[in-house]
């Protein structure tokens, strides 16, 4: 009998050891994925670079491109980022990308440093802000686009070979764009905070631009696509009130000046929102004001309470504890809209991650209609979304290119889908690119590491086809929010 007991004991301990080893290996695999994903997310921005590439460029299949941008307006507009899978520089989504990169650098600074990616994260941010500084040559002048969207999209060319028009478009006092100027002000203000610890002089330059742009946006009201009609078919703005709030919130955080807080408390809060994205920043502004309230840095008022309430309502809905919960796919992905859904998922995931830090610091929680949320609950939801994106989904596919082995091989991306100019300098023509590369059934010759595609549909189904642009096209606005989240959940 005792031998049986001893045998059972040994069996039990062996089973426990095996389970612990398997769990440890699983944790290590997840950690490895986070590390790989964080590194790749920043490499992606190097693949999106426009202009003269620096000596420390790590994505070596790319080359210099668009070196005459701005020449039609007698201004240097080289640099910046191509917005997605085309060769366009759209200022509106670029500015949002910049703000989110800055927010990651601010909120997750210690985590980025611990994972040895802080330098790369700041370089990704500076590539954007250097361009935005060039694009703002006068207080009331801001260049908001380089390139012709329609002609660019009719061609399938490497950025290094571009022959499409590179027209420069601007807003000014006579041709306003409060949304574009406001978002760019937010980007500059947020970036000034990110750079202040390491480069105070550069931070001061950025805050000067931010103040001028906010004043410009307020004084000359209007939608930017009315001044730059070419942008309307690609990144039309639905309004500018959110960008003005967003800019004021970042300027207040950067300067602590009362005038920006006054603007926030005198304006409408935006009410309940269903998304946070390049065209709707109300949630971002609400979260920044809620942070002030949690820290006790502002006097409580009906308006401040509403900002916090609206921010937390969005979070409750993302965490499935609200009155109007965000739809989830059967596999567990937060699903907002069919076209490039992951841009909304990554932005919402950033909000959850940042707010978890604010709650933890304040030792606070959120009272949702369907129960309380602690800081750890928010982080758990954020991690579940990251895990889904990196492969814990019904397709067993990572929707970030280059992570693991099963990831999209044919993202809708001109530069990645055409042989590198480093390998073959033969120019690729406008129609030739479509004939030889766009319609090629083979995987893209260049791995666009770190690119997050649009993602699966509401049934967790994804079609890995270059022509499937709604699902297969990556964009800077999708990856930017994920940088900080990856650093935090790692």
Swiss-Prot record:
E.C. number: 3.2.1.4
Residues bearing carbohydrate: 6
Listed GO MF terms: cellulase activity
Record flagged with keyword Signal: yes
GO cellular component, one term: extracellular region
Enzyme class, spelled out: hydrolase
BP GO annotations: cell wall organization; cellulose catabolic process
Keyword presence, Translocase: no
UniProt signal peptide: 1-26
Catalytic reaction equation(s): Endohydrolysis of (1->4)-beta-D-glucosidic linkages in cellulose, lichenin and cereal beta-D-glucans
Active-site positions on this chain: 86 (nucleophile), 412, 464, 473
Family, per entry: Belongs to the glycosyl hydrolase 9 (cellulase E) family.
Name by which UniProt lists this protein: Endoglucanase 13
